[in-house]
Structures are given as C-alpha cells and as structure tokens.
UniProtKB/Swiss-Prot annotation:
One of its GO terms (cellular component) is endoplasmic reticulum lumen. A motif (Prevents secretion from ER) lies at residues 198-201. This is Auxin-binding protein 1. It is found in: Endoplasmic reticulum lumen. GO terms for biological process: auxin-activated signaling pathway; cytokinesis by cell plate formation; positive regulation of cell division; positive regulation of cell size; positive regulation of DNA endoreduplication; unidimensional cell growth. GO terms for molecular function: auxin binding; zinc ion binding.
Amino acid sequence: MAPDLSELAAAAAARGAYLAGVGVAVLLAASFLPVAESSCVRDNSLVRDISQMPQSSYGIEGLSHITVAGALNHGMKEVEVWLQTISPGQRTPIHRHSCEEVFTVLKGKGTLLMGSSSLKYPGQPQEIPFFQNTTFSIPVNDPHQVWNSDEHEDLQVLVIISRPPAKIFLYDDWSMPHTAAVLKFPFVWDEDCFEAAKDEL
C-alpha cells in the first residue's frame, strides 16, 4: 500500500518546523557567547598620551615597542612612528624591508650592524656605533640589526618608516641567503589591528 502523501507532507512540515526552531535556538544561544576582543586600539585623536599607549615586547626578548602613530592603529598613510626601548645587551632580529627607516637615538648608545643587499647573503656586517642625539637611516632592503651594546643602560629610539605597514623579512643569521629570508607580514605589532581591519571589510 502506498503511503498517504498528506501524512508525509504533515510529517515533513513538523520536522521542518522543529529544525527551524532548533536553528533559532542555536543562534539565540550563540548571541550570548563571549566575543573574542581584538587588542587593537584605534585612536585617531590629534593629541595622544604616549604613556597611555599599548606597549609590549611582542615576544622579542629585551624589546619594548609602542606604535606612536601607525597605519593600522591611527590611519597613517605615508609614515609610521615607533618608540622602542632595547634592554642592555639585547638586539633586534636581523631583518630587511622595502621601506625607508630613520632612527633617532633618544637615550643610550649602541651599534648598528649593516649587511649587504648586493651579495647573495648579508655577509659579515659592518658595525657602526651610535649614541644619544644621533640619527641614522637604513637604505631600502639592506639587512640590518640594532644592538644595545651598552651593558648597563637601556637604548631608546624613535623610529620612522615609510609605506606602512612594514613587510619585514627575517634572517636566522648573517650567512642566510636573501632568498631564504622569511616574510613576516603582518609583523608582530600589527597582527591584531591587521586582522581587525581585514574583518571590517
């Protein structure tokens, strides 16, 4: 005997209503779940208190980084400004980037290590000392590292880069070929804001 189509239709309608109800219940319950907050602080104020800005090492030993004026945090288009403090004896990673970079030394002294961009790898770096109230520029794509060579005092620098956010290539050592350098983009201090900006599209 063939099933009664009206009974099948009624059963399907009941099942559909049940599933729709379950779906609404799940959506309603999900709306009460905590939402993961981004630690990205966006601030387009004309005047900002640096002491109130987020500061972190971002997993880089001996570094304290503040994005004073940035592309992702503050809407900057052409330049980005960082305030960085490097502990005695510590170094930034060996890296290069396709943007201009200018350092102004506010406190302390250190050594700039500069590798070659014209060879297959950075090679033995040139060591260039610097001290408080000096400034130095990094040529585009030249591998470099900033070292607080002082054993007692922090090194504090104001850093300005062009074309933010920076695309940074990291090296394990000075003999690593340029083609093996690893792109880190977004860089560690841009990750939260980069994800938030991407999510807003």
